[in-house]
Curated annotation (Swiss-Prot):
The lineage of its organism: Bacteria, Bacillati, Actinomycetota, Actinomycetes, Micrococcales. InterPro entries: AAA+_ATPase (IPR003593), DNA_recomb/repair_RecA (IPR013765), DNA_recomb/repair_RecA_CS (IPR020584), P-loop_NTPase (IPR027417), RecA-like_C (IPR049261), RecA-like_N (IPR049428), RecA_ATP-bd (IPR020588), RecA_C_sf (IPR023400). ATP binds at residues 67-74. It comes from Leifsonia xyli subsp. xyli (strain CTCB07). Its main location: cytoplasm. This is Protein RecA. Gene3D superfamilies: P-loop containing nucleotide triphosphate hydrolases.
Amino acid sequence: MPSPADREKALVTALAQIDRQFGKGSVMRLGSDERAPVEVVPTGSIALDVALGIGGLPRGRIVEIYGPESSGKTTLTLHAIANAQRAGGIAAFIDAEHALDPDYARKLGVDIDALLVSQPDTGEQALEIADMLVRSGSIDLIVIDSVAALVPRAEIEGEMGDAHVGLQARLMSQALRKLTGALSQTNTTMIFINQLREKVGVFFGSPETTAGGKALKFYASVRLDIRRIETLKDGTDAVGNRTRVKVVKNKMAPPFKQAEFDILYGVGISHEGSLLDFGVEHALVKKSGAWYTYEGDQLGQGKENSRNFLIANPDIAAEIENKIKIKLGIVADPNADAEPTAAAGSLEEKLPARKGA
């Protein structure tokens, strides 16, 4: 039997040969320092970024977002596209439902002049286009809306009443087998939006399931269940929805965490609203009755007024966000070893009339 030293020498020789034949890094030790940290695409909600455990949607992976109608699935993906573009990336939107609203996308911060859009005729065409874009190596984020609308060519060309059992599931399974490796190699994130269906004859457990078979459940590194839980009102007028997202699968961090945030009509995810919620939760922002207070100064009466104040003063919003991230350990504290500075002065200058509340 070879000695441990001989086995280690043989392993080093084999690894060197693999690197020469297949490229450096084809095989590596799991704890190697050469492994790069996970890159992410922010979702637009700090609450969801924290729930995901890594600060956003992972690069080079498949993500599934599913939920009932009008729950915020497309809104969430458009925010991710806008964030990817702000970071200098290129995004593509494969609109199998033929329902993308350019005006709404622009309001959410998407650069529609730079966004690549395809409205394919069949499921095969949609997935082939996605595969070609991924293999180009130039795309950072691809969204497919939605899995349920990826209709196989045989179904489109057939008669209305024809049975096509398992066609879509086989199509998805084959496509995902091809896409997974290419996504990892090109560091491209692919988001599949999916719809809910109900199983017939289920008496125990949830009857809900998603379209497109089981392959996507296995290949997705992150699965997000998004639900509308409350209608936000300004007086009697509905102005948005309170949304809850549950991370039902997460290969990058512990799963089953939840996030809640506001989606405002015509605005999208309220980033400032999430800052207020998280600030109150982590005692960085104080709430007394209807008033929100930060470092002894009143931001506003009611969440809407406080949110508007943060929109008008992005430097204060950024300060609160940075403190939240430091407290949660998402970013390092640059002043950990430094003397505390009098940062409150800038805030007092912006709030002279509210001082002393």
